């Protein structure tokens, strides 16, 4: 009876206590996945961030590429600048490297300069090279130039590298000094270092990079007073010439590019590059019978050396190796019968 009364009392108390209403299914219950319509704003924000990162990456890449192009152009233009070095005062063999840093406002100019001079003691031929690498940057390492190539400037303008910066300059007039054809706009070309009208590429005095750039009867060679090679007439009798038998300078300079510019041109047809008297200078001399040199000696006919032909030296070396291999094979063939006979005689004695 007491247990039944206690149970009824508990039921009455439970009924009397106010109960909170059941929560709405969308208020405090477990979170429900939003539908597709609710997810669009979040996905759109994520895509925008991704596109923004891609744009920043592309801008950074373009800036790095632009800086690299500007630096390469600066190095090439600085290498063509006048060095004002007196070659006569340098020793026959000379090597020097210098590094300088100059502060100009917020910019720092770094210049790396290398000078090399090599002289062949036998022929007297000389090779002089100068490399100037220039880097210009502000405190943040950025470079600012008005132009990079000639096409960046307007008509009748060209891109010039001066004072460690690129600027657009008006084209130079006729007979003015020049170092490349783009400085002489219009129908002008840079001929023997001066802007000239009515000139054709590959003619006498025009700028060249290799032998294929010059017309027949001319060769691409460096000239005193010019910092670039030009198409030069082949030397005639008594003029200085390029001796192909001197391989030292060829291996140092032009072996990797057989058609590149030379220090001197080979002789014209019918002439041969020979030592002048007893000196180390080579000049063009006739190759036919009856001609005499300055000492009164008769010049016998000689064929033009094969060194003028590209790859002839390697062909000679290959031929010598083949002859040596053939002689070794024949010697081994002669020794084999003798060795067999000796083996038979040795077996009978045993």
UniProtKB/Swiss-Prot annotation:
Name the glycosylated positions.
26, 28, 96, 106, 121, 204
Which Gene3D superfamilies does this one have?
Answer: Lipase, subunit A (2.10.80.10)
- Region called O-glycosylated at one site, residue ranges: 29-46
Entry GO MF terms: co-receptor binding; receptor antagonist activity
Write the record's keywords in alphabetical order, separated by commas: Coiled coil, Developmental protein, Disulfide bond, Glycoprotein, Secreted, Signal, Wnt signaling pathway
Segment forming the signal sequence: 1-21
The main location is secreted
Q: Name one GO cellular component term.
A: extracellular space
The ranges of region (DKK-type Cys-1) come to: 147-195
The chain's coiled-coil residues are: 40-84
Q: Per the entry's comment, what about the domains?
A: The C-terminal cysteine-rich domain mediates interaction with LRP5 and LRP6.
What is this protein's function per UniProt?
Answer: Antagonizes canonical Wnt signaling by inhibiting LRP5/6 interaction with Wnt and by forming a ternary complex with the transmembrane protein KREMEN that promotes internalization of LRP5/6. DKKs play an important role in vertebrate development, where they locally inhibit Wnt regulated processes such as antero-posterior axial patterning, limb development, somitogenesis and eye formation. In the adult, Dkks are implicated in bone formation and bone disease, cancer and Alzheimer disease.
Output this protein's name.
Dickkopf-related protein 3
Q: Which organism is it from?
A: Homo sapiens (Human)
